[in-house]
């Protein structure tokens, strides 16, 4: 049943609250506030009983799709199950009731947690230092780019280009532009990896850095990393790794050991914090020795005083790029990531990546006969199929397949990305899904592939069982209207 807007449920004069009688003289609002702050018309607020409000939002919540309900196969998003102990530790009064302007003397526990989290992230990725400030992955990218810029400025290098491989994460070009660089695309070869000939042709004295996602967005590990590292550093450029896909590498290999100078982590993805609906996120940045002096301030330092270990915030860093946000990062996500890492330990983190890789390859093998595979080779934690076969033979697009999947009770995968794959379906099952769940999802995808042959119109009209049917997305994009009308 379609749920009405809360404004449509409103009834004039109905109340969900009661106030005590005034114990002071009542005065008109215009005697207390300047007229410029007063409304000319009463606010259009819904009038409902408390029970009606509760039931309305409960009904809406039952319509939501989330990882606690079922598998969430969004490629490149790592929608893993988030252990509930993360929320427990985050809600501890000593953390939840803190204010970032508290004195350091009363914030030692929080400072210790952030210091130790940075140390663990350093070890996991093989980097020299880590800042926890960036609020999300793309914010971490921008931080890394500004670090690269500061490095070249100090050396007197006037470099204005950033190379971005076309299999990289989608936010890389935008971050490069925001950082003041010209973005130059490097092609992929027929295997889905960086085209070394194209890289050599575009790597010149104007290139500040190469941005690479590894594994890339078709789920393939860049096998030429040693050669890429040698070429980039030999050109006086730096090597940036987008850590969006770190869920494939934990305990197996480390970006720092591969020669990367700077990378960002997505704590909300790899280290399990809820991130559907826009956040909050956390995108810490790790750097090699050559970039440590440029890290954002304040830096958390550990020291000894009166025989006790203490922690402090140090803003006296002359070559810093400055702050990247107010205060010290999204602390609630930092607590969740810290809990996750401490619960799993080094061996557990390696099993996370091993199971993510196993799940992705198992699911791929179940689907590969039914959908085109642009790069036919083993993958890491995710894979990218193509709906080209269904489109050419039956007129069914990837968008139709994604909409039909909603009728089977699943959130759709990432579609039409990466751009190097026609009619792309990017699927990331994560390590937290059981074989039975993978099989059920595969069965749904296979059933849709069969429906494309036998009843393509059914798929083109999907979804048919959801509260909201297919929207006119083209009209919505061209005639944007986000105002509530009632």
Swiss-Prot record:
InterPro entries: Aminotrans_V_dom, GcvPB, GDC-P_C, GDC_P, PyrdxlP-dep_Trfase, PyrdxlP-dep_Trfase_major, PyrdxlP-dep_Trfase_small. One of its GO terms (biological process) is glycine decarboxylation via glycine cleavage system. Gene3D superfamilies: 6.20.440.10, Aspartate Aminotransferase, domain 1 (3.90.1150.10), Type I PLP-dependent aspartate aminotransferase-like (Major domain) (3.40.640.10). GO terms for molecular function: glycine binding; glycine dehydrogenase (decarboxylating) activity; pyridoxal phosphate binding. It comes from the Bacteria. Its EC number is 1.4.4.2. One of its GO terms (cellular component) is glycine cleavage complex. It holds the Pfam family GcvP2_C. It catalyses: N(6)-[(R)-lipoyl]-L-lysyl-[glycine-cleavage complex H protein] + glycine + H(+) = N(6)-[(R)-S(8)-aminomethyldihydrolipoyl]-L-lysyl-[glycine-cleavage complex H protein] + CO2. The modification N6-(pyridoxal phosphate)lysine is found at residue 269. Its cofactor is pyridoxal 5'-phosphate. It is an enzyme of class 1 (oxidoreductase). Keywords: Oxidoreductase, Pyridoxal phosphate. The glycine cleavage system catalyzes the degradation of glycine. The P protein binds the alpha-amino group of glycine through its pyridoxal phosphate cofactor; CO(2) is released and the remaining methylamine moiety is then transferred to the lipoamide cofactor of the H protein. HAMAP family: GcvPB. Belongs to the GcvP family. C-terminal subunit subfamily. NCBIfam families: PRK04366.1. The glycine cleavage system is composed of four proteins: P, T, L and H. In this organism, the P 'protein' is a heterodimer of two subunits. This is Probable glycine dehydrogenase (decarboxylating) subunit 2. The gene is gcvPB.
